[in-house]
Structure formats: structure tokens, C-alpha cells
């Protein structure tokens, strides 16, 4: 940790001295970078771009990114995501400065928050602190007993109808009444979306083969307390998931996640529900969780972009005047660099005149929980949302993850993950 800049140099440049701080300054001031998150078991590691003041790590925060802490004892390994994710911060803010002026940067700066760190200033850990931390960690490694039964994380769907919707349940949501849907032997189901067709309700979902670890898209009719036998509707030589299914005009479309292919592809239904033709490659990028919202003649695309698998994921917003038209990036992009809400968790929906975007929290681990965020402002120039309801896996015994939500009318469907013996779910 270098010495603090003081005096006239801080105001020598018109817009001050910009500096990275590799931790969340609401909890960590000082250093070493992204070490104390590991030490304290914090699931979130941060990075920020600030305008320096004479107070250590207390300047105006122009931009902040929050990433999942990488478990273990390697500080350098834990630095990879924050370093990589923040690599574009300066360029993004310089672009905004050029296009919109300094007042815009001040207006969009992270609001000041009270410091909540356990230490006033963090410094290089002492030998005794390292011993207190590493001793138990190394002891657990030495005493670790091999697991007799191999375990897998098994995803399933759960459905309910007639109960108050999750979005109406307030800060302590009630998820009682959900019925679990068992997957076929050797497979797991996740990422459910629902859509009506005539007087029938259907769900489309990710259907993964344990043996190949490759997903396809399957669908089933939603019936009282369950679903019909699933039918595969879209299968490729690469992994498919997150089937964002929707209607535009008189046509039914789907945008499945195909991140391993590196494209965002649009499919049109030519025979509902089981025949789909490729309509167009909408976007070429390593994208996940693409979710569409159509409103007032505009097509909005929420897309989580990542340069490398699992590194530096950011939520970007694009618009187009036609479904297959050219995408225009929103001037506020990226609209989130927070690992707790920058990945889609289901269809955007309107309820009681309010617009909601489900997002998943990947802080503790991928797909840990989901939040329903109310979209307060959505136009060509501004985007703003606020969290309303968060569902964590504690809603059902044994769950370690729940990351997708969909509802049509009073019917709701979610997914959930629990560790189970591999033999119990594989062929």
C-alpha cells in the first residue's frame, strides 16, 4: 500500500486524480487488495474507481463493481475477477465524460455510505493474524475425510397456483404450497419460463443430461399441481439453457442461452410447441441470461456479458426498433456490475402497473438466490431499478440454490437445487 496523495496535486487536473481501490470501500479501507474478504469469509469482493481525496479510500466513487469471492487462501486468485471486471471502468467513465459532461458523472456516482469495516484501516496482516486464519484452514485439509458417496447438485422445478404471488408477499415472502416436479432419471430441470397458448399453459425449461453435461430445451403442459411428460423441443451440439420464450405480434419466439457458442440467437416457432427454426443471430458475444421486454414499439434486451467464462460479468441493456433490428447500447451501460443482480432470473413482467426484472444472486455461488427488482425508470437515456423481494434457498429444506422465477396469472414456477447422492439421480 503506497503513500496517500495530499495537497495541490489532488486538484491539479480539472476532474481530479482517479484511482482504483481493489475492495469495497464501505467495508475495507487500506489493503492488501482483496485479501481481507478471504480472511473474514465475505462472499463479495469489490473494486471501485474513485476521485482521490486526502482521506484514504473515501473519495467520490465514480464506479463500483462487486464480484464473488473465490474460496481458498490465494489472494491473487481472488483478485482475478475484480481486476478483470474493472479493466474497462476508466474507458467507460471517460466516454461518459466526453458524451455527457462532468455533471453526469457526479449525478451517477455511487452515493456515499457509512463505513462498516471491522477495522478503521486495514493493513498487511501480522504473523499472528495469519496463523489464526491459516491454522484452522490447513487443519481441515489434513483431517478431511473422503466422501464415501459422490454427490451432485440436483436441480428441479416446483409449481403452485392460487396462492398470493411472491411479488405481493412483502419482505418475508411465503413460498408454501409449491409442489416439486421430479425430473427423468439421469437428467435435471432448471430455468423455467411459462407462456400461454390458447387455453393451455406451457413451461419451457433447461433439460440437462448428467452424462454429457449438455442441456437442451424441453417443454411440458402445466397441469393442476404438476406438468405433463416433458418433450424435447430444441437440441444442439452445444449447451442450451434459459429459454426466454415470448410473443411478438402473432408469432412465438425463443431466445435460449447459448453462451458456449458465443452468440445470442433468435428462434421462431413454426409448430407450437415442438418445432423451432433459427430466425436470426441477434448478437455475437459471450452472453448469458438474455431477457427481452417489449414496450411502446421498442425491444429491450437485458444481456449479461462476460469476457471470459465466469470473469467480469456485467449486465448490459440494448434496444432495437424491430425484433431483428440493430441493437443500440444504452448510455448507462453497463447497468450493473454487481454479482448479486447482474444476471437474469426469468422473464421481465408487469404486475399492478409496475415493471419487475428477476435477477439472480451469484455472490455465495452461482444461482444462490433471486430477487424481483422493480424497474423504476426505463427509457433511451436512463435506467433505474430497486430490489423488492428476495428469495433465498432457505424456503425449502435442503436447498442450496434457487435462481429462476416465472408466473402467468396466479400460476408460479421456480427452480431449486439440493445436493443428492449421484446414484439416486443418474442412470
Predicted features by range, described:
Residues 131-427:
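Carbohydrate-active catalytic/glycan-binding domains of CAZyme proteins
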Residues 2-132, 136-137, 141:
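Donor/substrate-binding cores of folate-linked one-carbon enzymes
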Amino acid at each position: 500500500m503506497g503513500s496517500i496523495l495530499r495537497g495541490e496535486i489532488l486538484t491539479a487536473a480539472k476532474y481530479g486524480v482517479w484511482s482504483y481501490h481493489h475492495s469495497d470501500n464501505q467495508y475495507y479501507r487500506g489493503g492488501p487488495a482483496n485479501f481481507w474478504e478471504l480472511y473474514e469469509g465475505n462472499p463479495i469482493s469489490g473494486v471501485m474507481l474513485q476521485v482521490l481525496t486526502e482521506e484514504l479510500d473515501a473519495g467520490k466513487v465514480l464506479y463500483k463493481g462487486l464480484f464473488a469471492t473465490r474460496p481458498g487462501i490465494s489472494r491473487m486468485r481472488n483478485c482475478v475477477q475484480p481486476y478483470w471486471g474493472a479493466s474497462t471502468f476508466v474507458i467507460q467513465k471517460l466516454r461518459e465524460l466526453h458524451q455527457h459532461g462532468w455533471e453526469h458523472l457526479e449525478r451517477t456516482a455511487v452515493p456515499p455510505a457509512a463505513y462498516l469495516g471491522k477495522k478503521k484501516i486495514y493493513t498487511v496482516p501480522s504473523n499472528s493474524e495469519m496463523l489464526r486464519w491459516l491454522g484452522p484452514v490447513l487443519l481441515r485439509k489434513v483431517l478431511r475425510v473422503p466422501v464415501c458417496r459422490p454427490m451432485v447438485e440436483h436441480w428441479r422445478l416446483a409449481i403452485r397456483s392460487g396462492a398470493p404471488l411472491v411479488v405481493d408477499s412483502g419482505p418475508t415472502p411465503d413460498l408454501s404450497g409449491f409442489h416439486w416436479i421430479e425430473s427423468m432419471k439421469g437428467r435435471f430441470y432448471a430455468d423455467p419460463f411459462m407462456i400461454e397458448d390458447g387455453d393451455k399453459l406451457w413451461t419451457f425449461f433447461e433439460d440437462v443430461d448428467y452424462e454429457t453435461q449438455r442441456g437442451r430445451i424441453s417443454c411440458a403442459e402445466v397441469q393442476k399441481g404438476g406438468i405433463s411428460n416433458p418433450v424435447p423441443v430444441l437440441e444442439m451440439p452445444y449447451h442450451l439453457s434459459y429459454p426466454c420464450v415470448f410473443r411478438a405480434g402473432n408469432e412465438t419466439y425463443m431466445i435460449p442461452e447459448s453462451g458456449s457458442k458465443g452468440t445470442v440467437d433468435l428462434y421462431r416457432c413454426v409448430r407450437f410447441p415442438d418445432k423451432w427454426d433459427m430466425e436470426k443471430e441477434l448478437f455475437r458475444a459471450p452472453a448469458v441470461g438474455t431477457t427481452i421486454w417489449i414496450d411502446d414499439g421498442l425491444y429491450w434486451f437485458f444481456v449479461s456479458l462476460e469476457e471470459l467464462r465466469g470473469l467480469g460479468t456485467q449486465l448490459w441493456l440494448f434496444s432495437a426498433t424491430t425484433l431483428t433490428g440493430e441493437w443500440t447500447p444504452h448510455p448507462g451501460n453497463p447497468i450493473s456490475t454487481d454479482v448479486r443482480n447482474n444476471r437474469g432470473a426469468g422473464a421481465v413482467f408487469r404486475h399492478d402497473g409496475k415493471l419487475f426484472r428477476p435477477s439472480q444472486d451469484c455472490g455465495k455461488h452461482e444461482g444462490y438466490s433471486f430477487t424481483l427488482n422493480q424497474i423504476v425508470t426505463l427509457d433511451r437515456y436512463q435506467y433505474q431499478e430497486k430490489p423488492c423481494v428476495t428469495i433465498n434457498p432457505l424456503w425449502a429444506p435442503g436447498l442450496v440454490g434457487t435462481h429462476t422465477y416465472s408466473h402467468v396469472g396466479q400460476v408460479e414456477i421456480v427452480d431449486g437445487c439440493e445436493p443428492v447422492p449421484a446414484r439416486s439421480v443418474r442412470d
